[in-house]
Amino acid sequence: MNVLIVYYSLYGHVAAMAQAVAEGVHQVPGMTATLRRVPETLSEEVIGKMGATEAQKALSHVPACTLEELEDADAIVFGTPTRFGNMCGQMRQFLDATGQIWMRGGLVGKPGGVFCSTATQHGGQETTLMSFIQTLLHHGMIVVGLPYSFAGQMRLDEVTGGSPYGATTIAGGDGSRMPSENELDAARFQGRHIADVTRRLRA
């Protein structure tokens, strides 16, 4: 069974979390993970002005997701950077193209989850995840979060992302902070959890 991990990453933070989610999926026997990016909407000029050209080159080996892959997957986990407390425009545009899938109920009953990154500790992690989950519910998906059985989200000894709605990371205002090991552990846990739930549902 396949868990599709669909994400957008400009500087690599969400990509690192996506890779950790995939690692968690692979810990469950019989489960595989497929990494896909949503199509870019920014021009190369804009990406260059944002200082993201090298990061984008490093991520270019990951294929763009097709709408058909959404329906073929047994479960889907979405990852996005936060833009003013919501998912990024690239992800929104991709999901806004799923109207035909919605009409035929192509995602109904599939487990789904979300993870994200923000610049700051209180930069909209939970609002991004909660607003994203609304789209999953409209598609009839079964939302799988990050339960408190992952004890790392209770830590107070370091600045860390994570909430029951999904794994998160804090990038810093200048993007210099990459996901911590605790945040990557959260992503692995979420991947393993959604893979296990998917396997049980399909059994």
From Swiss-Prot:
Cofactor(s) the record lists: FMN
Cofactor binding description: Binds 1 FMN per monomer.
Pfam families the UniProt entry points to: FMN_red
Record domain Flavodoxin-like: where: 3-194
Any GO MF annotation of the entry: NADPH dehydrogenase (quinone) activity
InterPro entries, A to Z: Flavodoxin/NO_synth, Flavoprotein-like_sf, Flavoprotein_WrbA-like, FMN_Rdtase-like_dom, NQO
Residues that coordinate or bind NAD(+): Y11
Enzyme class: oxidoreductase
Family as reported in the entry's similarity comment: Belongs to the WrbA family.
Protein name: NAD(P)H dehydrogenase (quinone)
